[in-house]
């Protein structure tokens, strides 16, 4: 069988997800990521290599959020790097599908990447606001960062001998309100808040702080509610 050429049309047909449930990815990121995929499939780089690069770019973007006084537009560069890391998040899957190297290791690495980047940009977002005089921001950032580590989910799955819990934090009752914390939604809200504040106030402002309050308080309370709910479900 003749090997298909990695043309844009072939890549779009074979590399796109059959069902893309994330509108931002479907209508904005995927149309961009396919061009990066077109370049990368011509190199020896694997999907896992791209995922590692995604982690590095995401961490650099997160750190930029924490140093608003280092240089004026640091948080702006931060959100741009975070958006680029999400492009790479789409690219790694497209490369894996084209090169037929989809694996559990790749999926696992991708999920670990999300956890690392989300927790870091939440903490750095809070630290950056704290550096600009929002005294409670550091505590909120720590709370939001800590809640991104689903320690309770690991413990629950282990004692209940299941791999995937049906009462995931985003799928049960009022906990659905926390969907805005999911990746990439939380990153996009953060990006919009930072861009708005820099446009209106020339730096971190009240919009970013209000968003951090939502991340730090609502998500923390939701996580506590989920832990209690799971505790009483166990025999």
Predicted region positions:
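C-terminal membrane-associated helical module and adjoining short loops/tails
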Residues: 1-32, 154-235
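Cytosolic juxtamembrane amphipathic/interface segments immediately preceding
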Residues: 33-43
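Generic transmembrane alpha-helix signature in multi-pass membrane proteins
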Residues: 92-97, 124-125, 188-194
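Alpha-helical transmembrane segments of multipass membrane proteins
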Residues: 38-39, 59-66, 189-196
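Hydrophobic alpha-helical transmembrane bundles that constitute the permease/transmembrane domains
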Residues: 56-59, 87, 112-119, 180-186, ...
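Membrane-embedded alpha-helical segments that form the functional core of polytopic membrane enzymes
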Residues: 47-105, 140-142, 204-215
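Multi-pass membrane catalytic core of lipid/isoprenoid biosynthesis enzymes
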Residues: 42-60, 79, 98-152
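Short helix-capping/hinge motifs at transmembrane helix termini and TM-loop junctions
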Residues: 68-69, 130-131, 196-197
